[in-house]
Amino acid sequence: KVFVDKLATFQAKFPEAHLGAVVAFGSTVWRHLSGGEGAEELKDFIPYGKGLAPATQYDVLIHILSLRHDVNFSVAQAAIEAFGDSIDVQEEIHGFRWVEERDLSGFVDGTENPAGEETRREVAVIKDGVDAGGSYVFVQRWEHNLRQLNRMSVHDQEMMIGRTKDANEEIDGDARPVTSHLSRVDLKEDGKGLKIVRQSLPYGTASGTHGLY
């Protein structure tokens, strides 16, 4: 409640920043806070491979997003103050918007994202039951090896992704590998496409670790 009130104050003070924030809870702490009620599909992430996709399983995620880094920073400070000793910050990542909404790989990210606030609500917000108004968050932090990527030809990069790099056009299904990123994430259930709202941004430093969060 304290953080929500502080967030509302910042939103009123900086309307042009289009500020928003989400507080999400991991499976274990949510079961404790809710008494086991709701969030039936909330589960711990199962790690994949030897370090390829580790499971961190943090208890709380605070995601802050706006058009101004200074506002984001101030809201993050307010969040830490509001939660106080009840949390111990394990990781703090600052993302940024890159050229033409592209990932550091040079490809446009989130092309198929649902457009418009109402459509996004329809896709992501739970409508009924004890979880009404809530949602699920799936967090992945990718580390990019851009040197290795840039050793590939643009054509090979496009075949790997499933879209053209400059024009951001989808490559026909028959012309792209079944192992391409686009082919793997084009999921359907009962013939209907499964949609998510992506909020990913590039992050990191030029001389150190960088990628997509």
Q: Which residues does each PLM region occupy?
A:
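Long, histidine/aromatic-enriched segments associated with O2/redox biology
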Residues: K1-Y213
